Amino acid sequence: MRCVLMVGLSGRQSSPTSIGNMTRALAVAIDGPAGAGKSTVSRALALKTGFALLDTGAMYRAYTWAYLKDRESYPHISIAESAIRHEISVTFDDGSTLVRCDGRDITRDIRSVEVTAAVSEVSAVAEVRDLAVELQRRTVATELSSGRGVILEGRDIGSTVLPNAEVKFFLTADPSARAARRGLETGQEVSEVIELIQARDLADSTREQSPLRKAEDAIEIDATHLSADEVVEVMHSRILDVASL
Protein backbone atom coordinates (compact mmCIF):
# COMPACT_ATOMS: atom_id res chain seq x y z
CA MET A 1 0.00 0.00 0.00
CA ARG A 2 1.35 3.38 -1.00
CA CYS A 3 1.98 5.64 1.94
CA VAL A 4 -0.50 8.51 2.17
CA LEU A 5 0.25 11.35 4.54
CA MET A 6 -3.03 12.93 5.60
CA VAL A 7 -3.03 16.16 7.53
CA GLY A 8 -6.28 17.22 9.15
CA LEU A 9 -6.43 20.86 10.13
CA SER A 10 -9.34 21.60 12.40
CA GLY A 11 -10.18 24.10 15.03
CA ARG A 12 -10.91 27.81 14.92
CA GLN A 13 -10.39 29.58 11.62
CA SER A 14 -8.39 32.79 11.73
CA SER A 15 -9.87 36.00 10.36
CA PRO A 16 -8.43 39.45 9.48
CA THR A 17 -9.72 40.82 12.80
CA SER A 18 -8.56 37.98 15.03
CA ILE A 19 -5.00 39.24 15.42
CA GLY A 20 -5.07 42.98 15.22
CA ASN A 21 -4.08 44.43 11.87
CA MET A 22 -3.93 41.10 10.04
CA THR A 23 -5.35 41.59 6.54
CA ARG A 24 -4.28 38.42 4.71
CA ALA A 25 -3.26 34.85 5.33
CA LEU A 26 0.45 34.04 5.37
CA ALA A 27 2.73 31.03 5.23
CA VAL A 28 5.19 31.16 8.13
CA ALA A 29 8.37 29.04 8.07
CA ILE A 30 10.15 28.28 11.35
CA ASP A 31 13.44 26.44 10.91
CA GLY A 32 16.28 25.61 13.24
CA PRO A 33 18.32 22.83 14.85
CA ALA A 34 17.02 20.17 17.23
CA GLY A 35 16.12 21.37 20.72
CA ALA A 36 15.90 25.06 19.85
CA GLY A 37 12.27 25.21 20.97
CA LYS A 38 10.62 25.21 17.55
CA SER A 39 7.74 22.93 18.55
CA THR A 40 6.89 24.86 21.72
CA VAL A 41 7.06 28.21 19.98
CA SER A 42 5.14 27.02 16.92
CA ARG A 43 2.27 25.69 19.04
CA ALA A 44 2.02 28.92 21.01
CA LEU A 45 2.23 31.05 17.87
CA ALA A 46 -0.49 29.00 16.18
CA LEU A 47 -2.80 29.50 19.15
CA LYS A 48 -2.03 33.21 19.25
CA THR A 49 -2.68 33.76 15.54
CA GLY A 50 -5.31 31.14 14.81
CA PHE A 51 -3.09 29.77 12.04
CA ALA A 52 -2.96 26.09 11.17
CA LEU A 53 0.16 24.29 12.39
CA LEU A 54 2.00 21.65 10.37
CA ASP A 55 4.70 19.90 12.39
CA THR A 56 6.79 18.58 9.51
CA GLY A 57 9.31 17.02 11.86
CA ALA A 58 6.57 14.84 13.32
CA MET A 59 5.94 13.41 9.85
CA TYR A 60 9.55 12.31 9.48
CA ARG A 61 9.58 10.96 13.03
CA ALA A 62 6.51 8.89 12.19
CA TYR A 63 8.27 7.36 9.19
CA THR A 64 11.26 6.68 11.44
CA TRP A 65 9.16 4.99 14.12
CA ALA A 66 7.51 2.80 11.45
CA TYR A 67 10.89 1.88 9.98
CA LEU A 68 12.32 0.87 13.36
CA LYS A 69 9.25 -1.28 14.02
CA ASP A 70 9.47 -2.86 10.57
CA ARG A 71 13.09 -3.81 11.14
CA GLU A 72 12.08 -5.93 14.13
CA SER A 73 10.25 -8.29 11.75
CA TYR A 74 12.08 -7.53 8.51
CA PRO A 75 15.74 -6.83 9.34
CA HIS A 76 16.71 -6.15 5.73
CA ILE A 77 13.87 -3.80 4.80
CA SER A 78 14.96 -0.47 3.33
CA ILE A 79 13.71 2.90 4.54
CA ALA A 80 11.94 3.55 1.24
CA GLU A 81 10.26 0.13 1.33
CA SER A 82 9.07 0.77 4.86
CA ALA A 83 7.66 4.19 3.99
CA ILE A 84 5.30 2.88 1.33
CA ARG A 85 3.89 0.21 3.65
CA HIS A 86 2.23 2.60 6.07
CA GLU A 87 -0.40 5.29 6.27
CA ILE A 88 0.77 8.21 8.39
CA SER A 89 -1.66 10.89 9.54
CA VAL A 90 -1.02 14.16 11.36
CA THR A 91 -3.92 16.20 12.72
CA PHE A 92 -3.98 19.56 14.48
CA ASP A 93 -6.70 20.76 16.82
CA ASP A 94 -6.64 23.44 19.52
CA GLY A 95 -2.88 23.50 19.86
CA SER A 96 -2.28 19.76 19.90
CA THR A 97 -0.68 17.70 17.14
CA LEU A 98 -1.70 14.04 16.96
CA VAL A 99 0.37 11.60 14.91
CA ARG A 100 -0.91 8.18 13.85
CA CYS A 101 0.57 5.27 11.95
CA ASP A 102 -2.02 2.95 10.40
CA GLY A 103 -4.57 4.31 12.87
CA ARG A 104 -2.40 3.88 15.98
CA ASP A 105 -1.64 6.98 18.04
CA ILE A 106 2.16 7.30 18.13
CA THR A 107 2.34 10.95 19.26
CA ARG A 108 4.46 10.08 22.31
CA ASP A 109 6.35 7.22 20.70
CA ILE A 110 7.92 9.42 18.03
CA ARG A 111 9.74 11.46 20.70
CA SER A 112 11.71 8.47 21.98
CA VAL A 113 15.50 8.39 22.14
CA GLU A 114 15.60 5.66 19.49
CA VAL A 115 13.56 7.69 17.02
CA THR A 116 15.60 10.83 17.72
CA ALA A 117 18.82 8.96 16.97
CA ALA A 118 17.54 7.60 13.64
CA VAL A 119 15.34 10.38 12.24
CA SER A 120 18.13 12.15 10.35
CA GLU A 121 18.91 8.98 8.40
CA VAL A 122 15.27 8.39 7.50
CA SER A 123 14.45 11.99 6.59
CA ALA A 124 17.46 12.10 4.26
CA VAL A 125 15.98 9.39 2.01
CA ALA A 126 14.72 10.99 -1.19
CA GLU A 127 11.55 8.90 -1.43
CA VAL A 128 10.51 9.82 2.10
CA ARG A 129 11.19 13.50 1.58
CA ASP A 130 9.35 13.58 -1.73
CA LEU A 131 6.21 12.15 -0.14
CA ALA A 132 6.30 14.57 2.77
CA VAL A 133 7.21 17.71 0.84
CA GLU A 134 4.52 17.11 -1.78
CA LEU A 135 1.86 16.95 0.90
CA GLN A 136 3.23 19.94 2.81
CA ARG A 137 3.09 22.19 -0.24
CA ARG A 138 -0.36 21.02 -1.27
CA THR A 139 -1.76 21.51 2.22
CA VAL A 140 -0.32 25.00 2.54
CA ALA A 141 -1.82 26.02 -0.81
CA THR A 142 -5.23 24.72 0.24
CA GLU A 143 -5.20 26.51 3.59
CA LEU A 144 -4.01 29.82 2.13
CA SER A 145 -6.66 29.71 -0.59
CA SER A 146 -9.30 29.30 2.13
CA GLY A 147 -8.02 32.40 3.89
CA ARG A 148 -6.21 30.71 6.76
CA GLY A 149 -2.55 31.24 7.57
CA VAL A 150 -0.20 28.30 8.06
CA ILE A 151 2.84 27.76 10.28
CA LEU A 152 5.38 25.08 9.33
CA GLU A 153 8.30 24.11 11.52
CA GLY A 154 11.25 22.03 10.44
CA ARG A 155 14.82 22.33 9.27
CA ASP A 156 14.52 23.31 5.62
CA ILE A 157 11.06 24.87 5.27
CA GLY A 158 12.21 28.34 4.28
CA SER A 159 15.07 27.13 2.09
CA THR A 160 13.53 24.09 0.37
CA VAL A 161 9.89 23.31 1.12
CA LEU A 162 8.46 26.84 0.93
CA PRO A 163 11.15 29.12 -0.49
CA ASN A 164 8.45 31.71 -1.28
CA ALA A 165 7.03 31.87 2.25
CA GLU A 166 6.44 35.50 3.16
CA VAL A 167 7.65 35.14 6.76
CA LYS A 168 10.69 33.05 7.66
CA PHE A 169 12.40 32.53 11.01
CA PHE A 170 15.52 30.58 11.96
CA LEU A 171 15.35 29.73 15.67
CA THR A 172 18.56 28.65 17.37
CA ALA A 173 20.24 28.47 20.79
CA ASP A 174 23.55 27.25 22.14
CA PRO A 175 23.88 23.45 22.60
CA SER A 176 23.69 23.52 26.40
CA ALA A 177 20.40 25.44 26.38
CA ARG A 178 18.96 23.14 23.74
CA ALA A 179 20.09 20.06 25.69
CA ALA A 180 18.45 21.36 28.85
CA ARG A 181 15.14 21.81 27.03
CA ARG A 182 15.27 18.37 25.44
CA GLY A 183 16.33 16.78 28.74
CA LEU A 184 13.18 18.10 30.38
CA GLU A 185 11.15 16.38 27.66
CA THR A 186 12.93 13.01 27.80
CA GLY A 187 14.21 12.83 31.39
CA GLN A 188 17.79 12.30 30.20
CA GLU A 189 20.94 13.81 31.66
CA VAL A 190 21.97 17.06 29.94
CA SER A 191 25.46 15.74 29.18
CA GLU A 192 23.97 12.78 27.33
CA VAL A 193 21.55 14.97 25.39
CA ILE A 194 24.33 17.36 24.34
CA GLU A 195 26.14 14.49 22.64
CA LEU A 196 22.98 13.48 20.79
CA ILE A 197 22.28 17.06 19.74
CA GLN A 198 25.80 17.62 18.46
CA ALA A 199 25.63 14.39 16.46
CA ARG A 200 22.22 15.40 15.11
CA ASP A 201 23.50 18.85 14.11
CA LEU A 202 26.38 17.32 12.18
CA ALA A 203 24.11 14.84 10.41
CA ASP A 204 21.47 17.43 9.55
CA SER A 205 23.92 20.04 8.27
CA THR A 206 26.04 17.70 6.13
CA ARG A 207 23.45 15.39 4.54
CA GLU A 208 23.01 15.55 0.77
CA GLN A 209 19.21 15.79 0.77
CA SER A 210 18.06 19.24 1.95
CA PRO A 211 20.56 19.88 4.75
CA LEU A 212 19.78 22.15 7.68
CA ARG A 213 20.46 25.72 6.65
CA LYS A 214 19.14 29.20 7.23
CA ALA A 215 17.29 30.76 4.31
CA GLU A 216 18.95 33.96 3.16
CA ASP A 217 15.85 36.04 3.91
CA ALA A 218 15.05 34.40 7.27
CA ILE A 219 15.11 36.34 10.53
CA GLU A 220 17.47 34.59 12.96
CA ILE A 221 16.41 34.45 16.61
CA ASP A 222 18.86 33.26 19.27
CA ALA A 223 16.68 31.86 22.05
CA THR A 224 19.52 30.98 24.44
CA HIS A 225 18.46 33.67 26.91
CA LEU A 226 14.85 34.15 25.80
CA SER A 227 11.71 32.50 27.11
CA ALA A 228 9.28 30.85 24.73
CA ASP A 229 6.82 33.70 25.32
CA GLU A 230 9.44 36.27 24.35
CA VAL A 231 10.25 34.41 21.14
CA VAL A 232 6.55 34.20 20.29
CA GLU A 233 6.14 37.94 20.76
CA VAL A 234 9.01 38.68 18.38
CA MET A 235 7.55 36.37 15.74
CA HIS A 236 4.00 37.63 16.21
CA SER A 237 5.10 41.22 15.76
CA ARG A 238 6.84 40.36 12.50
CA ILE A 239 3.80 38.48 11.20
CA LEU A 240 1.57 41.47 11.89
CA ASP A 241 3.99 43.79 10.12
CA VAL A 242 4.13 41.65 6.98
CA ALA A 243 0.40 40.84 6.91
CA SER A 244 -0.57 44.51 7.08
CA LEU A 245 1.62 45.57 4.12
Where in this protein do the model-derived segments appear?
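NTP-dependent small-molecule kinase module
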Residues: 18-21, 101, 105-107, 177-180, ...
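Hydrophobic positions on the alpha1 helix immediately C-terminal to the Walker A/P-loop
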Residues: 41
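P-loop (Walker A) phosphate-binding loop of NTP-binding proteins
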Residues: 33
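Small-molecule kinase domains that catalyze NTP-dependent phosphoryl transfer to phosphate-bearing small molecules
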Residues: 91-93, 136, 140-144, 155-160, ...
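N-terminal phosphate/diphosphate-binding loop that engages ATP/GTP or pyrophosphate donors
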Residues: 47-112
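ATP-dependent NMP and nucleoside kinases share a basic, alpha-helical "lid"
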Residues: 107-185
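Hydrophobic anchor at the beta1->P-loop junction of P-loop NTPases
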Residues: 30
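Conserved lysine of the Walker
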Residues: 38
